Amino acid sequence: MSTAKEASDFILTSVAKMLAAEDGAVQEAVRAITAAKRVFVYGVGRSGLVARAFAMRLTQLGLDTFFIGETITPIVKAGGLVVVVSNTGSTMSAVQTANIARRVGAGVLAVVGNRHSKLAQAANVVLAISEEREEKRGKFAPLGTLFEDASLILLDGVVAEVMAALGETESTMRSRHAIMV
């Protein structure tokens, strides 16, 4: 078996185990997202890429969504929701973003790999993705690969829940797609 195939199998199996997550927290996340006046999303590095993909889908759902750090992003205010994606939950800018959001009266949804992190403690809603430390992880899924893959899949599941809650369809989302596919 090739290393690529072995790595892919390992990643898929690991992510499936990691996503045996609590459905209650997902429902809380959906309520927070659909109730927010505006949704602001933040993450750094590969977690930031996952966050951007999530922000894109929320925009396609018709939600007023922004990525924190862009020059055209408005300020976060009370009634908004800040979604922060961070594996460690201790990235300084992620924790600061959550604390500032709370200070101005916005809600915070944290997607973290560490349920006991500073970011998780600063959040109103926590989607915790726990990773089992396996010997093969370093060889087949280095650094934060498993968290990033799992968080992307989990957030795509949240998108499906928000879609249902808002009565959206793929067709209505397509009409908001940047490329108008």
Question: In which residue ranges do the predicted regions lie?
Answer:
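A short, well-structured juxtamembrane/interface segment
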Residues: 18-35
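Glycine-rich phosphate-binding loops that contact phosphosugars or nucleotide phosphates
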Residues: 38-153, 159-160
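Short, flexible segments with low predicted structural confidence
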Residues: 3-5, 29-30, 72-74, 130
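Generic N-terminal amphipathic, Lys/Arg-enriched alpha-helix
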Residues: 1-21
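Internal, active-site/partner-interface "lid" segment
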Residues: 118-121, 135-139, 163-181
